[in-house]
């Protein structure tokens, strides 16, 4: 649900079918505006949230993805010893956010390069941010490149577009 620009509240709600239409109509009658999947995806990226299949999958380390906060280390789980080691010493790659310094829209699968032109990673999610009025994205880069403020290049249609690594989330609601 979207209420005017910069006043956003997105929630997935599960309700019995018998009540769904009444709840929907109540939201609309009170000024809420529906938004589509693309709008929801843009808001997800602005918040730095991962999408399974894009930003994370079964092979993704929660440490590399920046998801240590949702990993319960007091309980046993598959590969706990490996994840604990990564927690202690770090991972080779890290998920980062970046903001384009030039016009362009980063998309999943686009290459990330350092300023010397060396391959350093790949875009996992990207969009044009209406809140920031810039192209933004997330991706994985080698940990030596995963420093807030570092400049990188995103390859968009065979053109190198300068971007700056930034902290997540991209957008902070006021």
Language model region names:
Residues 1-10:
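Single conserved hydrophobic/aromatic residue that forms the stacking wall/gate
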Residues 37-55:
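Short, conserved secondary-structure transition motifs
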Residues 60-174:
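Glycine-rich, small/acidic residue-mixed loop/short-helix segments
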């Amino acid at each position: 649900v979207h209420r005017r620009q910069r006043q956003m509240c997105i929630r997935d709600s599960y309700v019995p079918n018998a009540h769904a239409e009444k709840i929907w109509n109540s939201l609309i009658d009170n000024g809420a505006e529906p938004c589509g999947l693309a709008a929801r995806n843009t808001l997800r990226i602005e918040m730095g949230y991962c999408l399974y299949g894009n930003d994370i999958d079964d092979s993704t380390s929660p440490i590399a993805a920046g998801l240590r906060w949702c990993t319960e280390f007091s309980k046993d789980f598959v590969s706990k010893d490996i994840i604990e080691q990564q927690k202690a010493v770090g991972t080779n790659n890290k998920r980062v956010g970046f903001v384009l310094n030039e016009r362009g829209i980063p998309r999943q699968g686009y290459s990330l390069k350092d300023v010397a032109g060396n391959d350093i990673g790949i875009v996992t999610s990207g969009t044009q941010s209406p809140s920031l009025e810039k192209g933004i994205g997330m991706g994985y880069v080698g940990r030596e490149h995963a420093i807030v403020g570092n400049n990188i290049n995103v390859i968009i249609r065979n053109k190198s577009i300068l971007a700056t690594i930034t902290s997540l989330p991209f957008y902070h609601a006021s």
